């Protein structure tokens, strides 16, 4: 089933602390807690999004005197460390409450630690700080409660708000539907690192989704491989409130972006996840099942030109319940058997005893460096 992280509607701003406002907040919180409290899917109630982190480290304090800072922060603690937890305690049967996301603990001063050994993290090194996708592996917290990457919606959606003369991501109309000041630049930068950057407008829209899907697939698989140390991965974001370039996996019209397909696969109850470490390919099996499962693992190294199998391995395995396990590994040089990394793909298949199949493909080189054969296919 689906568990819900239920935010109160406070985000990225400091709020008043006068008695009238606090009473208004209290009554609204009571109404909504009573409205939602009987839903068994609610995992926790969170006071706000990113206010603790912002007040600590985003430079918000600089324009205020020490006295003003103390007054503003008292208003903050009155709402999120006193009023809201009191409402939760009174009107629920012991539901969990988290004052702000991200934090390292529930007390005042328990600011986010990166990467965290406790609490939750918002990891935006990939995107805002221009970390490479591989950095996800080096930034593992206990619960990654926000991470994401932008893409454009598909061409069919873009046609809803553009004319032919607008078919440029830097056009006035396209810019109006891109509300991140660094959005187009980041997409181009990252695309240049991993893919060939297309000049065609439609291909750029498409490749932005491929890029986003790759980023989020790596993130989701990384977080799951580190189970049980990391036990949460919340993707920003699911959908849109208008047709726009954004971090969503479904656009305003509900059309799935490439990322959404990978989300379904990456969050399946069983995940087969290959990764290269120290010139060795490791195959992880990640299970959310409460019982162990047995089946057959097949690892196949295929030439991209279609001229046969380079290496194939088959093994009967048992996947332990509710954890992540390295189930198979092999030196990359042995896998290649004299072939170049750019000429092959590693296809991994796990088939359980019921016949259900879980697959993944792993490339040993960047996509822009792969030697894909020109099949002269016309679609």
Where are these regions (language model features)?
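Extended, hydrophobic alpha-helical segments in both membrane/secreted and soluble proteins
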Residues: 1-10, 25-32, 219
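Short acidic/His/Gly/Ser-rich catalytic and metal-binding motifs that mark active-site loops
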Residues: 5-7, 12-14, 53-58, 243
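Active-site neighborhood of glycoside hydrolase catalytic domains
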Residues: 15-110, 211-214, 253-254
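Substrate-binding clefts and catalytic carboxylate motifs of secreted carbohydrate-active enzymes
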Residues: 45, 79, 86-89, 98-108, ...
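Beta-strand-rich binding/interaction modules
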Residues: 281-329, 340-351
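Terminal connector regions
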Residues: 295, 332-375
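Conserved small/polar residues in nucleotide/adenosyl-binding loops
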Residues: 378
